[in-house]
Amino acid sequence: MRAEEPCAPGAPSALGAQRTPGPELRLSSQLLPELCTFVVRVLFYLGPVYLAGYLGLSITWLLLGALLWMWWRRNRRGKLGRLAAAFEFLDNEREFISRELRGQHLPAWIHFPDVERVEWANKIISQTWPYLSMIMESKFREKLEPKIREKSIHLRTFTFTKLYFGQKCPRVNGVKAHTNTCNRRRVTVDLQICYIGDCEISVELQKIQAGVNGIQLQGTLRVILEPLLVDKPFVGAVTVFFLQKPHLQINWTGLTNLLDAPGINDVSDSLLEDLIATHLVLPNRVTVPVKKGLDLTNLRFPLPCGVIRVHLLEAEQLAQKDNFLGLRGKSDPYAKVSIGLQHFRSRTIYRNLNPTWNEVFEFMVYEVPGQDLEVDLYDEDTDRDDFLGSLQICLGDVMTNRVVDEWFVLNDTTSGRLHLRLEWLSLLTDQEVLTEDHGGLSTAILVVFLESACNLPRNPFDYLNGEYRAKKLSRFARNKVSKDPSSYVKLSVGKKTHTSKTCPHNKDPVWSQVFSFFVHNVATERLHLKVLDDDQECALGMLEVPLCQILPYADLTLEQRFQLDHSGLDSLISMRLVLRFLQVEERELGSPYTGPEALKKGPLLIKKVATNQGPKAQPQEEGPTDLPCPPDPASDTKDVSRSTTTTTSATTVATEPTSQETGPEPKGKDSAKRFCEPIGEKKSPATIFLTVPGPHSPGPIKSPRPMKCPASPFAWPPKRLAPSMSSLNSLASSCFDLADISLNIEGGDLRRRQLGEIQLTVRYVCLRRCLSVLINGCRNLTPCTSSGADPYVRVYLLPERKWACRKKTSVKRKTLEPLFDETFEFFVPMEEVKKRSLDVAVKNSRPLGSHRRKELGKVLIDLSKEDLIKGFSQWYELTPNGQPRS
């Protein structure tokens, strides 16, 4: 064989020239597909322009189409971006939580210590997910697909072309078990469900393809195991439902991409959420029996545990949302009040930042704890309503306290408070508690368990009373009535109407649904029932049941088969009627008050007991005595609006400091408020008993007011303090400086002189999950000028000392006895609050560049030593460094 001659270093071989195409050929092969793609895009973009010109349409239609396309593309990109972000969170959960620890969008087990993380359950689900996917795929093809084809003749070609449930499995972000309920025969567990799936489901119907590529579902799923048994299988049934409507977002493909179009995407998602809510959101539930032969009626359709009556009274200091040319205007506020699937909307108060509604809404509550009261405030506009703040209240504490009358601070807004009165109404069977309707409020509820009907007439035009006999039927109607009716039921009590589901083509329909009504007058109101045919749009039977007919039956329950009027001779409907009366029950005596108004259950009855047994000492009084100081009318009016009717008995003992000196009587308007006793008269040490009355005590509850004591003006010598503070003291932002003003002190050491006192009421509100600090007022403050001082109070929850975490009261001008009555809330978990301290400083407001003294004193309170659930209200002595005097 002849050896091949070696080629020159720069020359290509003949074999390489045959196998490797030249650069011109490669360039042409790449440009050809790109050129074709470019031409197709140009034709696609210019096609609508040519079509508009051919049809003689104006350019407005082109702009409108371009706008709709851009909007659709924006929605599409946003949905894909949210899905990608959710996938990233699932893949890097630990890093995301570490980076966003201070954020609000975190799993429930981080925010709430009673929610446990169950990572072991997620590992089990992840391991078994491929097998579960195979099971679901077979169920879809073998059972779901034939059922869909049987629904209509137009769905006979319906086929699942692709079923892939992806690698992303559902997760349980947190589990909370409720063990403090009274029912010992049930286990209640709340699961924080999160499914961010990469599933791909495609369907085909008459060569039209559609499908889903990605689903997000988040919500709280409650699982109830009830009743617990002593033998196998130890559980009678499993009940599953969502406490609130879950959040659902679907990424559509194929023809269903049109559902992402502007104006349609929100409607499509809401329709799917409503479809889930009709089956799985309270009061709807799914009950799966575990033990055979068990009656599941009470489990599938339980009675409400109570009724909450919401008095939407007023709001104040709402944010200004109506702006015109940069000028701040007012708002047109209205409120949306909801519990689960029950929603109400108040009327709109136009151009008012302090609206008054005085409206009442009533809700049925099925699960406590679990369901929350949500209030959202909006500013009504012609284009889009602006958000003014929201509020979420746990109904468990309202059920415990029976009545809560409180001003609530709105969340997610700059300013605003909402005044609500919440009443928990118990369901009773005692007819003695039945009262007449007062002001349109409900006195009872009616629960209707609609079971089934039998022997409904096929021909709705052949009633015995001859109502439809005279009508002439067309040939189409005669042929149609030979089929069984598709019946549904309309039930109404008063102005409220409910409609059942439709049972297609069945003369013995089974509905198995429950409906609830509020009753205003049991003696006069009736239940109106009408069975209708969905195909013929006519009545198949009617029934009227007076509600007073239920009163003679045991447990106010009537269960029987009722004969339908205007129907066949043997047409019956089976249902159960349950009547319950509504009443606000009194709280048990001696039980601790845990509601939000507990912060303001201060001294209502004040008793003064002299401890000096001198000749001028007065004996202990049996009844309450009022202070000689005249109250402020405006503040009293405000306190009455915050009052509530239920309190607990408690007694607080405080020692009133003695006045060292008495000065000349001040002149001016504030002199009457500053002095409680005649000038020049010596005061003896006295013990102040602050008594909070029990639930049967009359009169409104007022906020704690500081005790008015005579001012003791004295001069301070020139002095500068810079005390060394350790531990938490070094974190306080108050730097005490007394060298800015020359005053005189008789007697020496500044540390031994009193700087005044401040009254605080501190308590952890479980209802709001926050620490509430009520600044009541101050007394005996140090004067900064000849006219007194302009004090205000600054509060920090150490160790947080950022400007955003700073709380500040309003400034009270020219007074040494300021009354604030301002509440601040710190949204911190209970376990975290125990590790914190309060830094409360009283300061003097001074103009910019002024040399007046700013610091008047401060107080440091270690919260780990206090009972925050019970709360405390007392006077604290102001010191330069916040520590109590030794």
Swiss-Prot record:
Residues 664-673 have a biased composition (Basic and acidic residues). Residues 642-659 have a biased composition (Low complexity). SMART domains: C2. Residues 1-21, 613-673 are annotated as: Disordered. Keywords: Calcium, Cell membrane, Endoplasmic reticulum, Lipid transport, Lipid-binding, Membrane, Metal-binding, Repeat, Transmembrane, Transmembrane helix, Transport. Ca(2+) 2 binds at D322, D332, D379, E380, D381. Residues 291-408, 426-566, 754-876 form the C2 domain. It is found in: Cell membrane; Endoplasmic reticulum membrane. Ca(2+) 1 binds at K321, D322, D379, D381, D386. InterPro entries: C2_dom (IPR000008), C2_domain_sf (IPR035892), C2C_KIAA1228 (IPR037752), Ext_Synaptotagmin_C2A (IPR037733), Ext_Synaptotagmin_C2B (IPR037749), Extended_Synaptotagmin (IPR051634), SMP_LBD (IPR031468), Synaptotagmin_SMP (IPR039010). Widely expressed with high level in cerebellum and skin. GO terms for molecular function: calcium ion binding; calcium-dependent phospholipid binding; phosphatidylcholine binding; phosphatidylethanolamine binding; phosphatidylinositol binding. Its main location: membrane. Residues 801-808 are annotated as: Required for phosphatidylinositol 4,5-bisphosphate-dependent location at the cell membrane. It is a peripheral membrane protein; Multi-pass membrane protein. Residues 1-29, 72-886 are cytoplasmic. Residues 114-291 form the SMP-LTD domain. Ca(2+) 3 binds at D381, D383, D385. The chain crosses the membrane at residues 30-50, 51-71. GO terms for cellular component: cytoplasmic side of plasma membrane; endoplasmic reticulum membrane; endoplasmic reticulum-plasma membrane contact site; organelle membrane contact site; plasma membrane. Anchored to the endoplasmic reticulum membrane by a transmembrane hairpin structure; both N-terminus and C-terminus are cytoplasmic. Belongs to the extended synaptotagmin family. PANTHER family: EXTENDED SYNAPTOTAGMIN-3 (PTHR45761:SF4), EXTENDED SYNAPTOTAGMIN-LIKE PROTEIN 2, ISOFORM C (PTHR45761). Binds glycerophospholipids in a barrel-like domain and may play a role in cellular lipid transport. Tethers the endoplasmic reticulum to the cell membrane and promotes the formation of appositions between the endoplasmic reticulum and the cell membrane. Interacts with ESYT1 and ESYT2. This is Extended synaptotagmin-3. The gene is ESYT3.
